[in-house]
């Protein structure tokens, strides 16, 4: 039996969220979070419109160059995506300060995803949330059982479930949990890791990493996750967004 996600205006019911990860101005899907891996899938705005036309209610937009290097080389491409769609956009990648986060929220992004910045300064969560309630998602990317930061290159020693509970107390509106070890590999999910995070908090948990089949989507739904981010499986046509939304 599915535990069911917490009541939330963010995700009123379980949702499948297409990923639009941008590197050098193009959509890419990395394997295991490693630079130079994976495949390219074209123009970000075209991809975003494709998923909205297919029924997406939320888009997961990530600036990979920002995540790895902290630069804003993709700023124009990312802004074009936000302006082109009329659905919720959650944005992450290279957001290092409360000023960065607030500026994005002021210019049309619905939710900001804080990863490295939240680990380095947990108070940033409350600082942004005070001005923009229900708009801060804390990203916990796990590799080898610990939270990793700085483009998935540095270990922190933090346990994902324990970290999730801490950020809930800091004011996070949701947790994005990414299993980097299986990200982009199309080899399936590790639902026990997701379930640990879900059980640690009373805010929505968005699961990401490893989805390759509709059964993977169903498995993550049954953990009580509020939503699942799907990238490679959708781009490669393993299933359609409509099929996933019927799970």
Task: Enumerate the language-model features and the residues they cover.
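Alpha-helix-loop-beta-strand connector modules within alpha/beta enzyme cores
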Residues: 70-90, 126-141, 187-212
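Glycine-rich, proline-tolerant flexible connector loops at the mouths of alpha/beta enzymes
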Residues: 58-74, 176-187
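Glycine/small-residue-rich loop that forms an oxyanion/phosphate-binding "nest" at active or ligand-binding sites
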Residues: 62-65, 70-130
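C-terminal helical cap(s) of enzyme catalytic domains, especially alpha/beta-barrels
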Residues: 124-131, 221-247
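Haloarchaeal acidic low-complexity proteome signature biased toward cell-envelope/secretome components but also
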Residues: 1-17, 244-247
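Catalytic cores of alpha/beta
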Residues: 82-112, 193-228
């Amino acid at each position: 039996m599915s535990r069911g996600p917490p009541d939330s205006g963010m995700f009123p019911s379980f949702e499948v969220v297409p990923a639009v990860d941008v590197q050098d101005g193009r959509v890419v899907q990395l394997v295991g979070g490693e630079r130079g891996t994976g495949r390219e899938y074209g123009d970000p705005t075209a991809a975003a419109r494709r998923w909205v036309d297919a029924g997406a209610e939320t888009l997961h937009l990530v600036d990979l160059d920002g995540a790895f290097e902290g630069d804003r080389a993709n700023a124009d491409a990312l802004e074009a995506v936000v302006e082109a769609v009329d659905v919720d956009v959650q944005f992450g990648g290279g957001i290092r300060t409360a000023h960065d986060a607030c500026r994005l929220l002021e210019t049309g992004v619905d939710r900001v995803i804080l990863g490295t910045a939240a680990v380095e300064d947990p108070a940033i969560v409350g600082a942004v949330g005070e001005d923009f309630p229900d708009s801060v998602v804390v990203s916990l990317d796990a590799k080898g059982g610990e939270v990793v930061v700085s483009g998935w290159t540095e270990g922190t020693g933090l346990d994902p479930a324990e970290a999730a509970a801490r950020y809930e107390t800091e004011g996070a509106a949701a947790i994005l949990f990414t299993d980097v070890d299986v990200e982009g590999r199309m080899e399936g999910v590790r639902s026990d890791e997701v379930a640990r995070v879900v059980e640690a908090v009373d805010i929505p948990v968005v699961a990401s990493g490893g989805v390759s089949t509709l059964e993977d989507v169903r498995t993550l739904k049954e953990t009580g996750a509020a939503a699942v981010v799907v990238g490679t499986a959708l781009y490669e046509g393993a299933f359609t967004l409509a099929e996933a939304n019927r799970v």
